[in-house]
Amino acid sequence: MVSQDVEIINRLGLHARAAAQLGKLTTQFRSKVFLKKEGQSANAKTIMDVLMLAGTQGTQITIEATGEDEQEALDTTVKLVAARFNESE
């Protein structure tokens, strides 16, 4: 299991489009990928789970990956968050 803390930096936070991108990205990996915030846990491959976290701009989350390609899954997910979910702002 590997994990990393990140900050949601895009203006709209974890909204539907960002959650969909996250789900599309993480389903490419065999590893389980979870987002954790203040005791809540969300399967990153499930849009509704991600939306339930209500991650707004400035929210700190932990990305956690477990499985055979866990490091690649973590690194790629962190890059997506750092890239503001590829949204222009």
Predicted regions and their residues:
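A composition-driven signal for long, intrinsically disordered, charge-rich low-complexity tracts
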Residues: 1, 30, 39, 84-85
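C-terminal structural segments of small proteins and small subunits
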Residues: 56-89
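Short amphipathic
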Residues: 1-10
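Compact, glycine-rich, soluble single-domain proteins
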Residues: 9-48, 52-57
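Conserved beta-strand core positions
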Residues: 4, 33, 59-61
